[in-house]
Amino acid sequence: YTGWSFCTNMANVTAQQGGNLILNNFFGVLLTTAYGLANQVSGILYGFVTNFQMAFRPQIVKLYASELVDDLWELVLKASRISFYLLLFIAVPSIVNIDFFFSIWLKQVPDYSTTFCTLIIIYCLIDSIQAPLWMTIDATGKIKAYSIWLTCILVFNLPLSYIILKLGGPPSTFLVVRVVLNLITAIVRTIYMKFFIGFPIRIYCKMVLKCCVVLVISFLLSYLLKCLLDNLELSKILSVLSSLII
């Protein structure tokens, strides 16, 4: 268990830190700075939901060990939904008003910082709704096949990004590839849960679809308020409130 878990963690670190090497190689230090800024935003977002997610992890392990399958799936679905909405509460206003926040935070904003941070927020949203699933897989102790699949997908990020950038792709290529591969790992993880643990994938997909609808409506409403209101400060407040209400 420890060895396979280590492989997955190393693949995650390689996928994240490899971005610095690739961006520095193709575009220099300035875009590396923008990527570092995006990673800081990622750390803030993860810190916001991590404490909540860690609170239900022992319960997941307990329910699996007790073979209380129905209660386990109910907890996993509920935890996924709440984790997503908690992060959504700060993700939507952050994306909509990201230029405003940067103007307060930094005197000089590096190029592509807005794009990088938007993509990293999307990445974090995918992770938030998937966290209870990988916690459940960890609780089973049967992670060999899962870790092999996950490691292969995550490490594929670097060569694929390098090839696309070599062919003239934009600087955001690395993070776009990361988001797409994270989505693929989410699909693989969900399918693995279905076939090896009996996870109710149909109910989970319906829940994910509802979350996506809420995300789109929240974003559109927040963006519409931002565009319509003349008072800049008021628009920021209402953007946050609209995401909370929805």
Describe every region a protein language model picked out.
Residues 8, 12, 35-54, 84-90, ...:
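Transmembrane helix-bundle signature of multi-pass secondary active exporters and lipid flippases
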Residues 1-16, 55, 59-74, 195-209:
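Interhelical loop/hinge segments that connect adjacent transmembrane helices in multipass membrane
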Residues 1, 22-43, 71, 110-115:
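Interfacial/gating helices of multi-pass transporter permease domains
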Residues 133-141, 191-206:
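Alpha-helical transmembrane segments
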Residues 96, 108-133, 145-148, 176, ...:
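Alpha-helical transmembrane segments of multi-pass membrane proteins
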Residues 144, 151-187, 194-195, 199-201, ...:
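Membrane-interface helix-loop junctions in multi-pass transport and translocation proteins
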